[in-house]
Amino acid sequence: MTSEVSRRDFLKASAAGAGFVLTFRIAGGATSAAEAAGAWEPNTVFTIDPSGIITVHITKAEMGQGVGTALAQIVAEELEADWRDIRIDYPTSDPKYGLMLTGGSWSVNWTFDALSRAGAGARHLLIEAAAKHMNEPASECIAEGNRVRHLPSGKFLTYGDIVSKGLITATLSDEELKKIQLKKPAEYKVIGKWIQRLDVPEKTNGRAKFGIDRFLPGMVYAKVIYPPTRTGSKVVSVDDSEARKVKGYISTVREGDIVAVVAENYLAAVAAQGKMRVTWDKGPHANVTTDSITQDYWNKAKNDTSAPSWVDVGDADGALAKSMKTHEAAFWTDYVGHAPLEPMNCVARYQDGTFDFFSGSQFQTRAMGDLSKLFGVKPEQIRVH
């Protein structure tokens, strides 16, 4: 696995390549904890348990944009699920989920077809299984609201019934999956409709867990001493004599130009961080400021004719040349930091040959590659939660 992936490479990726490989498994030998518990997990997208609860596995990071609800809506639409029975979870990183990346407003775009076919394919198998059990033609049965109903007689089986009885014994090939006719927008009952976001209740009652909420037995706390510039700063010297006097101080860690202090608890780490004395060579970017960055881009916008234009419609130069009067205006927006409201954090654990990392990451796939390279281990020894 490589971590050398650029934004240009992302944009080149197709929806299929960036999404999922959908393989519908035959029920029988359990291949996951969910299936071992009697649930049906036809693919990497969702699980239906014996009670009929459908859990959609969200592999995109929830950053306030509602992506968990949006992706669950896509599955629920084609699955003909009752929205009240839909749940979501956020699985640990795994190559089986494909590219685990969130950004650029790509989540729905990249996964729409794959998620739709995951739901539609499962619906097809549920109908076939229920029809066979009821001894009725599948052509006379429909799926609606988490159940399969035989239209002439009114007989029905819920999805939970079908799963708990282990009735699904068929599978779908890739070709069959591709041939399934998806709904037209005019037929949507869930997509595009006002719907309560699935992540809001836990975020309002305090049950939602963020990276910073992770606590492990015996964990210690580290605080990084940040350099004075974004890039280019080099450590000249480190004086931790005062930091060592802080109650709870454990050690000072230096890896190249990264310096951190480790302590028994968070407050001790903060106190020790404040007493660290690091001398820096600020390097070539010592005088870079928001004003200098702004001026640099302003000069490029006015004078660099090779720079690409965001909008290029018509003959602006020709129109200006013919105009009796012209008006020039500059529009500015504040410099915005690309950072979450939650303080940046990561909890790491090494146990039984596996590294576990708990963090609010929007690019789990790259994290696995970078971390495996950093620690000199195989990517499968890295788990990003």
Regions found by a protein language model. Give the residues of each.
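Structural alpha/beta core scaffold segments of enzyme domains
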Residues: 1-385
